[in-house]
Each structure stands twice: as structure tokens, then as C-alpha cells.
Swiss-Prot record:
UniProt keyword annotations, A-Z: ATP-binding, Coenzyme A biosynthesis, Cytoplasm, Kinase, Nucleotide-binding, Transferase
CDD domains tied to this protein: PanK
HAMAP family: Pantothen_kinase_1
Natural source organism: Nitrobacter winogradskyi (strain ATCC 25391 / DSM 10237 / CIP 104748 / NCIMB 11846 / Nb-255)
Nucleotide-binding listed as a keyword: yes
Family membership: Belongs to the prokaryotic pantothenate kinase family.
Encoding gene (name): coaA
UniProt xrefs under NCBIfam families: panK_bact (TIGR00554)
Coiled-coil spans in chain: none
Protein name (database record): Pantothenate kinase
GO BP annotation list: coenzyme A biosynthetic process
Catalytic activity: (R)-pantothenate + ATP = (R)-4'-phosphopantothenate + ADP + H(+)
EC number: 2.7.1.33
Amino acid sequence: MDSRADQQQYNPYRVFPRAEWAKLRHDMPMTLAANEIAALRSMHDRLDLVEVEEIYLPLSRLLSIYVAAMQRLFVAQRQFLGIHDRKVPYIIGVAGSVAVGKSTTARVLQALLARWSPRPKVELVTTDGFLLPNAVLERRGLMQKKGFPESYDLPMLLSFLSDIKAGRAPVRAPVYSHLTYDIVPDSWIEVSHPDILIVEGVNVLQTGPLPRDGRAIPVVSDFFDFSVYLDAEEPVLRDWYVTRFLALRDSAFQDPRSYFNRYALLSDDEAIATAIAIWERTNRANLEDNILPTRPRANLILKKGADHVVERVALRRL
């Protein structure tokens, strides 16, 4: 047997080059204008009509099929049990490294899915709000590991997702400020009976330790109905992080309230050296130790090239 065919046979994913994936859009309509797409794009991402048409519309079509199937299964189970539970939200996880473009992908999906017919209520929550406050991280010696699994208030995040799946409302999530690099005290967003909830974060596919006493320990992805992993090679991610750091030095870091205001006056060479040091110390370590090992747990992997566009798509076999 051909070794490549054998490898493909046992590969848990079907891998599509960009051109093949784009054909799966079929007649899924484009519901976003160019100016709306531009507003969804993060500062260093490349997102345009072509990227939405060729990558995200096929994904939107796929998700519409998955959501409809889940709704039919829910109705069948309800009839079987003879109960009248409220329909639970369909939860989509979006994972991947710092600087890979998770926020852009999550916002694009929210915008596209919210324009399905009939118009579903689609909410987006990032796990940044579930980071422990800086004061707690400082006390525990975890500031250099912010974004690592141990830096999150996992019980609060699991409680939030459990309440969402249980149909409770409203459910509150803390607010995080990228300006102050900290949780905003006494500030919350409320999520109330969404049809679809998108949860975006670097470690949302993280697994927990195996139980020693036989009792199951829930993890965030236990609550997901579908998950997307944004992927790129590590040197590419580092370059994107450095580019973003330079852009922030000239914008957000200039604000005196910014946690990173001390970097605002760095020269280009100093800023690049600082960004690379942060990447190597924190973000690369988190990627290699915690984030990348969760990639095989995703239902769908979007692999990006150095130009920020998706080159191929891997869909987990059923």
C-alpha cells in the first residue's frame, strides 16, 4: 500500500488544500460587506473578502449543518425522555497561540453565524476575563506565566460554562482590560440564553490531570460542541508577535494608563529585542508546553502561512 495513502487512512483528519476547501462553500451567501470585514480584523491580521469567501463561508456552512444536527438530536432526546427542557446553547471553542489571530476568527464567526436564517443569538466570550487578577498572580509568583493554564480561575470558568449549558440566565463573566493588563474590578458582561456561544482563548482545549480517586475532573472543552484551532509555525508566530508589539508601542502603549507604557519610548531595536525576550520566556514556552499539545483535540484546524492567510484546513473525521 502507498505509504501516503496508508497515513491518510489512519489520519483522524481529512486535510483540504485551500482551493478544495473553498469549493465547499457551495451557495452559502456572503452576508458581510468589505467595511464590516475590515472592522472585524485585528491590527496585524490579513482578512478580506476573499479570505471570508474561501475559508470562513465554507466553515459557516459546515457549522450550520452541525448545529442543525444537534438541534434535531436535542428534540429526539427530549421526546424520548418525555421532558420539556429549554434548548441549550451550541458552544464553539476557538484556540491557538498568542498572535495567531484567534480574536479575528472568533469575531468573523460570530458575525457570519448571527446572519443565518432565522437570526440566531450569537455571543462571544474570551477567557481573558477568567485570568486571575494581577495581585493574585503576583502573590503566587505567576506573573511571568500569565496565560498559562495555572493563571486562570478555572473553577469560575467551569461554573460559567456549566450555567450556560444548564440554561441559566443571565450568566456573568468578568471583564479584562488589555490596557491595564488586569481584570476590571466589579465589571461584568452578561450572557443570557444565546443560541450559540463562542469561547475564545489560548488554552480552551487544555486537559486536566487524570483523577486518582476515579472521579472525573471536568475541563473547559467538555462543554464544547465544536472546536477550532488556529495554527502556524512557531517562527511565523514569533514574527507576528514582534510586529504586533511594535504596532502597540506606537499606539496603545503610548497611553499613560497602559501597563506597558514603559515600552512606549523604546527604539525599534530595543522594542524588537524586548518582544523576542517576552516571546521566548513566556509565549513560546506556553505554546510548546500547553497550547500546541492540545491541537489534536480540535474538530477543525486552520493552518496559516506567513502571509496570515489560511493555506489548508483539517477536519476531524466523524
